[in-house]
Amino acid sequence: MVSTIHCDSLWYGADIVTMRGGKYHLIPQGAMAVTDGKIVWIGPYNELPRLSASREVIYSSGLITPGLIDCHTHLVFGGDRSAEFEQRLNGVSYAEIAANGGGIVSTVRATRNASEQQLLEQALFRLKPLLAEGVTCIEIKSGYGLSLESEIKMLRVARQLGELLPVTVKTTCLAAHALPPEFSGRADDYIDFVCDTIIPQVAKEKLADAVDAFCEHLAFSLAQVERVFLAAQQAGLPVKLHAEQLSSLHGSTLAAKFNAMSADHLEYATESDVRAMADAGTVAVLLPGAYYLLRETQCPPIELFRQYNVPMALASDANPGTSPALSLRLMLNMACTLFRMTPEEALAGVTCHAAQALGLQETQGTLETGKLANWVHWPLSHPAELAYWLGGQLPASVVFQGDARP
């Protein structure tokens, strides 16, 4: 006698794009059974086992993809730098803007001056458009406080976002983002402060899931970043790195040495960097929004990532200076158009590979038995349309941990 499987809910009637192994692996007319917020069965509807579901949801058509994951953002910050955008378009250089108190220094000042509640309200305003596009998991960095009090304030706000809205929030301590004004000309002293004070306190309060740094001529050196990584290691936190965005310092090789979850930007990564990332299992997080806004001309080495089987993730890099992007779907099109990624690679970049960049590959990023029941139902007929359309085509519905998101 065939036993009956009991589940909380059964969902069927749409084609399911599972993204197993980074490929579409489409199930026509698929079905998913969910219990306790996890998928307990997935497959073609006509192969359903005997099920008893407390609730059934029938999709009349369309596509289901895994919930989208934005694995690199700077959503929490104070102030507004839209005026700088106009200035740059009128020929004012970034150096001139910075000399007049603008640039990242203005964001640091505004973030320090803002209350926790003000930062929370502003971040909610930025997060909601991403959720409307089907984002079910997001990473949020600190890095605009650059003091113990303000870095902790930013991370607390990021944690609150995950408590207030139906979305998984992973937080990253990016205190080694820029040099605060009070440490002008004393970068090593600031790195001492980050390593000896900020990272240990953030770890003690369990406010961060990872530690990041910015390795670049205008930020921090390889030696300074290595000290940050050692402090993170001592605190029991994994690392990731902004690397090779504007020049080749081989920061991604250093990141790989520390088994970083990801190295991000990577426009100037070399073959040796890519090989090191492949050996370490470090994900390449590509950020076409920043590439676009900065009018960069050097693309990340996509062919090398393919050759060495380095997983490529995509993210919005939502931030006030170089990527004021509140659309992860737009990044799919940009990655295909600017970086020549395929639509399938792009979708993998905001699902399974983005999950890997956050260390969440065991629970999110694909639609498989045992994974969280996070998915998006789209009024589309082919998954390539997600990268093809510029704007529009919002999800018909989003499911987060087995429940339809309001």
From Swiss-Prot:
Catalyzes the hydrolytic cleavage of the carbon-nitrogen bond in imidazolone-5-propanoate to yield N-formimidoyl-L-glutamate. It is the third step in the universal histidine degradation pathway. It is an enzyme of class 3 (hydrolase). InterPro entries: Amidohydro-rel, HutI, Metal-dep_hydrolase_composite, Metal_Hydrolase. Pathway: Amino-acid degradation; L-histidine degradation into L-glutamate; N-formimidoyl-L-glutamate from L-histidine: step 3/3. The lineage of its organism: Bacteria, Pseudomonadati, Pseudomonadota, Gammaproteobacteria, Enterobacterales. This is Imidazolonepropionase. N-formimidoyl-L-glutamate binds at Y144, N319, G321. It comes from Yersinia enterocolitica serotype O:8 / biotype 1B (strain NCTC 13174 / 8081). GO terms for cellular component: cytoplasm. Its cofactor is Zn(2+); Fe(3+). 4-imidazolone-5-propanoate binds at R81, Y144, H177, Q245, T322.
